[in-house]
Design a protein with these regions (language model features):
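Bacterial N-terminal signal peptides that target proteins for export
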Residues: 1-3
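C-terminal motif of bacterial Sec signal peptides marking the signal peptidase cleavage site
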Residues: 12-15
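Acidic/polar, low-complexity intrinsically disordered N-terminal segments immediately downstream
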Residues: 17-92, 162-171
Length: 171
């Protein structure tokens, strides 16, 4: 019995060996968060966000913040990323919106925001316009999930029923 106990103790000392733990080493990628929490238990995929300046009396600019998610290790310093306007899917003119001059994903964050400023214009009384933005790979980031690199904003200055308006409000 003593011999068996001694043998087990010796084996346990031999089996203890330090090993390096593998960490995630893939290139970093970005994608737009497309899911919105609609209730405590439900989420909904959002492809287009909508604004009407008629719902924001007195406002001449509105800012929407798109959530951008990081795939890969957190950044150790603020890092530049790129976004382009998809001309073929955009009807808004350059004077109807603005983007930050330099787009930076902040260090230590797994999620950041892309602020897009919409500008009220007289032409928005007659029509709604679309702005489609696309993440673009650069030397710092690749593209994340397929189907999550574009976002779209629809905006106007027309009197429209708000999304939250239901038959209950009318009754």
């Amino acid at each position: 019995y003593t011999l068996l106990l001694g043998l087990l103790a010796a084996l346990s000392l031999v089996s203890c060996d330090k090993q390096e733990i593998e960490t995630y080493h893939a290139n970093r990628s970005l994608f737009f968060e497309r899911w919105k929490q609609t209730s405590a238990t439900a989420r909904e995929r959002i492809d287009t966000v909508g604004y009407s300046f008629s719902h924001y009396v007195g406002e001449t600019e509105l800012t929407h913040e798109f959530q951008i998610k990081l795939i890969g290790a957190l950044l150790e310093e603020d890092t530049e990323y790129r976004v382009s306007v998809v001309d073929s899917l955009t009807t808004a003119t350059g004077d109807q919106y603005s983007l930050p001059e330099k787009l930076m994903f902040h260090k230590g964050m797994a999620s950041d925001v892309l602020p897009v400023t919409l500008k009220k214009a007289p032409s928005l009384k007659d029509k709604q316009v679309y702005l489609t933005l696309r993440l673009v790979a650069n030397e710092n980031f690749g593209l994340g999930y397929t189907g999550y690199s574009d976002v779209k904003i629809r905006f106007n200055d027309q009197e429209v029923i708000p999304l939250w308006w239901t038959q209950e409000v009318t009754d």
